[in-house]
Structure formats: structure tokens, C-alpha cells
UniProtKB/Swiss-Prot annotation:
Residues 1-18 form the signal peptide. Expressed by the skin glands. Belongs to the bombinin family. It is found in: Secreted. GO terms for biological process: defense response to bacterium; defense response to fungus; killing of cells of another organism. The keyword Methyltransferase does not apply. Residues 19-43, 74-124 form a propeptide. Keywords: Amidation, Amphibian defense peptide, Antibiotic, Antimicrobial, Cleavage on pair of basic residues, Cytolysis, Fungicide, Hemolysis, Secreted, Signal. Pfam families: Bombinin. The modification Isoleucine amide is found at I144. This is Maximins 3/H3 type 2. Maximin-3 shows antibacterial activity against both Gram-positive and Gram-negative bacteria. It also shows antimicrobial activity against the fungus C.albicans, but not against A.flavus nor P.uticale. It has little hemolytic activity. It possess a significant cytotoxicity against tumor cell lines. It possess a significant anti-HIV activity. It shows high spermicidal activity. Maximin-H3 shows antibacterial activity against both Gram-positive and Gram-negative bacteria. It also shows antimicrobial activity against the fungus C.albicans. Shows strong hemolytic activity. GO terms for cellular component: extracellular region.
Length: 145
């Protein structure tokens, strides 16, 4: 009779130990997941700050270009540059409120079309901005030189 109790108690102790080991493993894996999520949040925060600084710099450069072209007579080419600059400014402003812009632009699209739309929008914004800034700097250097 004592042998049965010893076996039963040993079995209960072994199963309790196995459960505690399993719980420890789960808590460690959950802790690892939480640490990874926290790291990703930090990286996203840094990326957001860099993007915000870049947007501010681009807006400042675009406004400076606009004020340069605003106070004098413009050629047809400069008028076209101004139109593009205004479009870029609107796109940059829409980046400040991506949820609203996404709702307006993506109604009725599936997820693949949405991803393609944002990729195209990023290319559409960055390409002309870099071109405009390069052209403006080139024009200013020619005038100074």
C-alpha cells in the first residue's frame, strides 16, 4: 500500500515539475517576443523621426524654390516646374496624414493593389523632388557663377 502512494506522489511531483518547466519555457519565449517587438518599435520610431526630418527638409527646400520662382516672371518651363512642385507639396502634405490619404486613395482596392499604389506614390514623390532640388541648385549655381 505504501508503495502505491509513493508511486502516485512521485508521479504527481514529476508532472508538476514538467508543467513548471513548460511554463518557464513559454514565459521565456513570450519575453523574447516582447523584446523583439520593443526593438521593432524603437527601430520604427527612429525611422519615423528620420522620415519626419527628411520631409521637413524637403518641404523647406520646396517652399524656398517656390518663393524663388514666385517673385519674377516665369518661362513656360519654370511654370511647369512650379506645377510639379505644387503637386509634390500636396503629396508631402498627404504623407503627414497617411490614414486619411490611404482611405481616399484605396477604396475598393485589394491588398496587392494598395501595396503597389504606395510603392508608386513613394517613387512619384521622391523622383520629382530630387529632380527639382537638383535643377534648382544647378540654376542657382549658374546664376551665382
Amino acid at each position: 500500500m505504501n508503495f502505491k502512494y509513493i508511486v502516485a506522489v512521485s508521479f504527481l511531483i514529476a508532472s508538476a515539475y514538467a508543467r513548471s518547466v513548460q511554463n518557464d519555457e513559454q514565459s521565456l519565449s513570450q519575453r523574447d517576443v516582447l523584446e523583439e517587438e520593443e526593438s521593432l518599435r524603437e527601430i520604427r520610431g527612429i525611422g519615423g523621426k528620420i522620415l519626419s526630418g527628411l520631409k521637413t527638409a524637403l518641404k523647406g527646400a520646396a517652399k524656398e524654390l517656390a518663393s524663388t520662382y514666385l517673385h519674377r516672371k516665369r518661362t513656360a518651363e519654370e511654370h511647369e516646374v512650379m506645377k510639379r512642385l505644387e503637386a509634390v507639396m500636396r503629396d508631402l502634405d498627404s504623407l503627414d496624414y497617411p490614414e486619411e490619404a490611404a482611405e481616399r486613395e484605396t477604396r475598393g482596392f485589394n491588398q496587392d493593389e494598395i501595396a503597389n499604389l504606395f510603392t508608386k506614390k513613394e517613387k512619384r514623390i521622391l523622383g520629382p523632388v530630387l529632380g527639382l532640388v537638383g535643377n534648382a541648385l544647378g540654376g542657382l549655381i549658374k546664376k551665382i557663377g
